[in-house]
Curated annotation (Swiss-Prot):
SUPFAM superfamilies per record: Pyrrolidone carboxyl peptidase (pyroglutamate aminopeptidase)
Name of protein: Pyrrolidone-carboxylate peptidase
GO biological process terms, semicolon-separated: proteolysis
Keyword Protease: yes
EC class name: hydrolase
Subunit (UniProt): Homotetramer.
One Pfam family named in its UniProt record: Peptidase_C15
Domain of life of the source: Bacteria
Keywords: Cytoplasm, Hydrolase, Protease, Thiol protease
Catalytic site positions: E80, C143, H168
Origin organism lineage: Bacteria, Pseudomonadati, Pseudomonadota, Betaproteobacteria, Burkholderiales
Primary subcellular site in the record, as a coarse category: cytoplasm
Function per UniProt: Removes 5-oxoproline from various penultimate amino acid residues except L-proline.
UniProt similarity note: Belongs to the peptidase C15 family.
């Protein structure tokens, strides 16, 4: 039975919870078609997070990997297009590290694109009633760090054998209550969005060609 690996992060920056972990763990063990979802938590720590996802790739040998992270301030589920080879941390990670203008992989490519049908995923998430969009930046904190590390590792595999990408998600309502004016999505909406994204990624190899860009 094929495995779909979903990863979420531990809480960071004084948050008591991280919506990425709450959402992915709700799907742990669920079957989508003939595949089964396995959810695992990553540390919000530079270096250690890439090491952890690498170990999961070795032990689980998934057919599909979607890493998920918190993006407080965003109003939609953001399916990321590209990971860039730089750490530039506005805040320290959970181990106190704050790399500035540091390559994630020395002499690695400047960027990697997700190998998921990102526009088809957004289309189907919206059709399911979930606010979603294509995002052109995963930031320069641990989320982008993991996204780049994941894609660098998957680049070793024969093309198309293991596909991967990243989805950013908004705060949960209980977090937004601590950050007045910030948008949020209910946990059940986030779970529905991830379930839909997984189903589309499993069933769709070639992405749709439709508008998904931004002017700025």
């Amino acid at each position: 039975m094929p495995t779909v690996l979903l990863t979420g992060f531990e809480p960071f920056e004084d948050e008591p919870i991280n919506p990425s972990w709450e959402a992915v763990r709700a799907l742990d063990g669920e079957r989508v078609g003939d595949a089964v979802i396995v959810a695992r938590q990553l540390p919000c720590v530079f270096g250690a997070a890439i090491d952890a996802i690498g170990e999961l790739l070795d032990t689980l040998r998934p057919a599909l990997v979607i890493a998920v992270g918190q993006a407080g301030g965003r109003a939609e589920m953001s399916v990321e297009r590209v990971a860039i080879n730089v750490d530039d941390a506005r805040i320290a990670d959970n181990a106190g590290a704050q790399p500035i203008d540091t390559a994630i992989v020395a002499d690695g490519p400047a960027a990697y694109f997700a190998t998921l049908p990102i526009k088809a995923m957004v289309r189907d998430m919206r059709a399911a009633g979930v606010p979603a969009s294509v995002s052109q930046t995963a930031g320069t904190f641990v989320c982008n760090h993991v996204f780049y590390g994941l894609m660098h590792r998957l680049a070793r595999h024969p093309a198309g054998t293991v596909r991967g990408g990243f989805i950013h998600i908004p705060y949960l309502p209980e977090q937004a209550a601590r950050h007045p004016g910030q948008p949020s999505l209910a946990l059940e909406t986030l779970v529905k969005g991830l379930r839909t994204a997984v189903a589309t990624a499993l069933s769709t190899r070639a992405d749709v060609r439709e508008q998904g860009g931004q002017l700025h």
